[in-house]
Amino acid sequence: MSRYKLFIVDDSALIRLRLKTSLALWPEIQIVGEAENGQEALKKIPLVKPDVVTLDLEMPVLDGLSTLKELNKVYPVPVIMLSSLTTHGAKATIEALENGAVDFVPKDGDWNKVVSELKEKIKIAVLAKKRPKPFTGGTLNPKNVILGKNGRQLVVIGASTGGPPALREIIPKLPQTFPVPIVIIQHITRGFSKPLADQLARVSRLKVKEAEKDEQLLPGTVYVAPAGYTFKIDKQGGSLTAKIIEPVEYLPAHFYPSVDEAMLSAAEVTGSKTIGVLLTGMGKDGALGMKAIKERGGYTIAQDEETSVVYGMPKAAIDIGGVSRVLPLSAIAEEIAANI
C-alpha cells in the first residue's frame, strides 16, 4: 500500500501535535516533517519531498500566504490551507486558493470533523493531476464576439476542487455588457462564498455578489450561491429569481449548494435558453444537470482534462453524454460569450 507523505506547517505546537496524533491513526499517511513557521518550512520541504503540505494561514516570521507563494517557486507541491472562519481568515483563504492551494480546511470547531475533512482532502490533493495556476488575466476581444445572438437567458457554472482560480480565469474576461445573469455553484465551506464573490468582484467588470433569498437575477450580474444552502433557479412574475433554502437535514453525501440541483432547476425554468458550464472538481455533481440542460436544447461546456486540477465532475458529465463542447480553461469565457 502506498502512503501519502505529509508535511505539517503550523505555529501552534498543540495543533501540530493534535494533527500528528490524529493522522497517525490513518495507515495511508506518513508524516515526514513539520515546521512552526513558513521560513523553516521552505528550508525543510525540498529536503523531505512530501506529497502534500498542510499550511496554516496565520503564522509569525512568514505567514501562510507568503509561504505558499515562495513554495510555488522552490518546491511546487499540493497544499491544503488550514484557516480560521474569521472575515480576515476567509478572505486570505480565497486568495490562497487563487495562488495555487488545492483546497482548505477550517480548523475552528469540532476537531473530529476537522480531521475527517482533512483526511479526505489529502487524498484529493494527492490525486490532483496538477496544482491550480494563479490568474493570468486578459479580456475578450469584443470584435470577435457578438453577444446575445442565441437568445440565452441564463448561465450556470459549477465547480469544486480548483474552482476559485478557474472562475477567476473566466469571469474577469466577460464584458460589462454581458446580457444575462450568471450563477456560480462552487463547493465551499459555509462562510467562504461571500469572500469568493468579493474577490471575483475586485477583478471583474461584471457585478459579482453572493446571491440572496428570492432576489431577482439580473443581466450582467454574477451570483455566487451561498455555501451551506440548497440553491435553485425559480421564476416569479416572468423574472428569474434565486430560490435559497436552509436544509432541514444535511445529508452526508450531498452538496449544499448542489450543481445538479441548480442545473436541473435551470433546465426546467430556462430550458434551451440555458448555458451550463462544468469546471474542475472531484465526484459527479453536475453531470445529471448538464445532461438535462443539453437534452432541453441548451448548450453545455466542460473543462478539459489537461487544465482541470481534478477531472472528476467534467468527465462524469462527458461520460453520460451531457456535454456539447470540451475546452481548455483559457477558451471557456469566449465560448460562453459566443453562444449566449
Curated annotation (Swiss-Prot):
Chief place where the protein resides: cytoplasm
Localization of this protein: Cytoplasm
Domain CheB-type methylesterase: 148-340
SMART domains (alphabetical): REC (SM00448)
Domain Response regulatory: from-to ranges: 5-122
Enzyme class: hydrolase
Molecular function (Gene Ontology), one example: phosphorelay response regulator activity
Catalytic reaction list: [protein]-L-glutamate 5-O-methyl ester + H2O = L-glutamyl-[protein] + methanol + H(+); L-glutaminyl-[protein] + H2O = L-glutamyl-[protein] + NH4(+)
Entry-annotated residues carrying 4-aspartylphosphate: 56
UniProt PTM: Phosphorylated by CheA. Phosphorylation of the N-terminal regulatory domain activates the methylesterase activity.
Domain remark text: Contains a C-terminal catalytic domain, and an N-terminal region which modulates catalytic activity.
Protein name, per record: Protein-glutamate methylesterase/protein-glutamine glutaminase 1
Gene name tied to this protein: cheB1
